[in-house]
Design a protein with these regions (language model features):
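Active-site metal-binding motif and surrounding structural segment of the metallo-beta-lactamase
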Residues: 29-46, 138, 177
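Acidic, histidine-bearing metal-coordination/catalytic regions of metal-dependent phosphoesterases
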Residues: 1-9, 14, 29-33
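Extended active-site neighborhood of metal-dependent phosphoesterases/phosphodiesterases
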Residues: 50-143, 158, 166, 172-175, ...
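Acidic/histidine-rich helix-loop elements
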Residues: 7-21, 47, 88-98, 153-156
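Short acidic, glycine-rich surface-loop motifs adjacent to enzyme active sites
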Residues: 44, 138-155
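Histidine-centered catalytic micro-motifs
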Residues: 145-151, 177-186
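Active-site glycine-centered loops adjacent to acidic/histidine catalytic or metal-binding residues
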Residues: 12, 41-42, 74-75, 148, ...
């Protein structure tokens, strides 16, 4: 059954988690019916530091205990090239490509929408075939992609031609409605 829904999208909370906490509580007050919250990476500044994670969740108390968080890996979760503390925080779908590693990329359907969460810290090629299959095998009306590093950026040095070329072609092929990205702090 198709159920109308909304969601909240944010990214790059890592700098000033107290300020971010205020924003997320405002979003919850303004949109208490939002089905879930998507975070497009950089949830914390130091992904290998437990204190950063404690602060992240503490600042979201009253929101993430009521609404689901849909996280995406950013570069800050890869502190020391190891996102294991990020992976320890969540029980994510284990339906991503084997090449990417467990729970680093995943997809899910909600109502009449497909959400595909990608790990842009890895080469786009490692997830391209799986990404194509997710869209090809879905009958969802609405299609969303979530990843951290921007395909197009307001800063030339942050542009990601690999994401644009490889994932962008797949997004175009399946008429993806929206690509939600982070990293630019815009």
């Amino acid at each position: 059954k198709v159920v109308p829904f909304s969601f909240v999208y944010m990214g790059d909370a890592q700098n000033g988690l107290d300020r971010w906490g205020s924003l997320i509580h405002t979003a919850y007050r303004e949109r208490p019916d939002a089905a879930f919250y998507i975070m497009a990476g950089d949830l914390v500044n130091r992904g290998a530091e437990r204190n950063d994670w404690d602060s992240f969740f503490q600042n979201a108390t009253g929101v993430f205990d009521r609404r689901q968080l849909v996280p995406c890996l950013g570069n800050h979760e890869y502190q020391n090239n190891d996102p294991s503390l990020y992976l320890d925080q969540f029980a994510l779908p284990a339906n991503g490509p084997a090449e990417a590693g467990p729970e680093r990329a995943y997809s899910f359907e909600y109502s009449n929408a497909l959400f595909v969460v990608l790990d842009s810290n890895q080469l786009p090629e490692t997830q391209a075939e799986w990404l194509d299959q997710q869209f090809a095998n879905s009958k969802a009306v609405w299609k969303f992609a979530v990843y951290h590093h921007p395909a197009y950026s307001s800063s030339a040095r942050r542009d990601n031609p690999g994401v644009r070329k490889i994932w962008g072609a797949i997004f175009d092929k399946y008429h993806v409605d929206m690509a939600l990205q982070g990293h630019d702090h815009a």
